């Protein structure tokens, strides 16, 4: 396992609440939303605009727009001591000075991504079955995500392996940090924790909340109580 450079390694090890948000272009409140969510206890914040209401209305984010949104998130993350993640794009992660690059199964090969972003940023990987989990445990990624636990509109058409995969990963007792992902909200969180997860990724549980800070705080309190 690669040893992450300080202070990113300790920050990742202590993280339990990971938020994926779109750029909120149709609302125009990204800065206020991000600050509220981070104040509520979010440890990592990732920009993922694919399939968002903003994308449907305005079209895909251009690189310059994505960097502008990431600058907003970076400022909020620095104020709150959180990590900033970029989805898929190693070049954007490098340009934004992101702490984390998250790769899906069909994204850049890991060695290529590492050459682009350099030694400092963390790299995460999505996993959806036992074989992918085994690969993520063995390869030089710093963390991995396990799911979807439930079908989710952010990944339309993807079969959800469910909590069975979460239980399997928990039984492996790997030292590498991992996060359960996919359809997790406050009501479902106890099931996820009972399955053995201690870290989660959420989207709508916070992005759709009337009070993002309070929603994040309730999730974080439930996580740290285990």
Curated annotation (Swiss-Prot):
Binding residues for Mg(2+): 88, 107
Name of the molecule in the record: Thiamine-phosphate synthase
InterPro entries to which the protein is assigned, alphabetical: Aldolase_TIM (IPR013785), ThiamineP_synth_sf (IPR036206), ThiamineP_synth_TenI (IPR022998), TMP_synthase (IPR034291)
Family: Belongs to the thiamine-phosphate synthase family.
Phylogenetic placement of the source organism: Bacteria, Bacillati, Actinomycetota, Actinomycetes, Mycobacteriales
Pathway given in the UniProt record: Cofactor biosynthesis; thiamine diphosphate biosynthesis; thiamine phosphate from 4-amino-2-methyl-5-diphosphomethylpyrimidine and 4-methyl-5-(2-phosphoethyl)-thiazole: step 1/1
Catalytic activity: 2-[(2R,5Z)-2-carboxy-4-methylthiazol-5(2H)-ylidene]ethyl phosphate + 4-amino-2-methyl-5-(diphosphooxymethyl)pyrimidine + 2 H(+) = thiamine phosphate + CO2 + diphosphate; 2-(2-carboxy-4-methylthiazol-5-yl)ethyl phosphate + 4-amino-2-methyl-5-(diphosphooxymethyl)pyrimidine + 2 H(+) = thiamine phosphate + CO2 + diphosphate; 4-methyl-5-(2-phosphooxyethyl)-thiazole + 4-amino-2-methyl-5-(diphosphooxymethyl)pyrimidine + H(+) = thiamine phosphate + diphosphate
Cofactor remark: Binds 1 Mg(2+) ion per subunit.
Record organism: Mycobacterium sp. (strain JLS)
Uppermost EC category: transferase
Cofactor section: Mg(2+)
């Amino acid at each position: 396992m690669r040893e992450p450079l300080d202070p990113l390694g300790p920050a990742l090890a202590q993280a339990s609440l990971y938020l994926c948000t779109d750029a909120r272009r149709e609302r125009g409140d990204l800065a206020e939303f991000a600050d509220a969510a981070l104040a509520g206890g979010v440890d990592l914040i990732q920009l993922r605009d694919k399939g968002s209401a903003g994308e449907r209305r305005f079209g895909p984010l251009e690189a310059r727009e994505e960097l502008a949104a990431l600058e907003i998130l970076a400022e909020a993350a620095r104020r709150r001591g959180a990590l900033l993640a970029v989805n898929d794009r190693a070049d954007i992660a490098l340009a934004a000075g992101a702490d984390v690059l998250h790769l899906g199964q069909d994204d850049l090969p890991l060695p290529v991504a590492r050459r682009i972003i350099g030694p400092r940023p963390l790299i995460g990987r999505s996993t959806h079955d036992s074989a992918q989990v085994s690969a993520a445990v063995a390869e030089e990624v710093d963390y991995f995500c396990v799911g979807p636990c439930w079908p989710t509109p952010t990944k339309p058409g993807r079969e959800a392996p469910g909590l069975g995969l979460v239980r399997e990963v928990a039984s492996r007792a790997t030292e590498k940090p991992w996060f359960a992902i996919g359809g997790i909200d406050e009501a479902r969180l106890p099931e996820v924790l009972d399955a053995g997860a201690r870290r989660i990724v959420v989207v709508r549980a916070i992005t759709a909340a009337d009070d993002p800070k309070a929603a994040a705080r309730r999730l974080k309190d439930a996580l740290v109580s285990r």
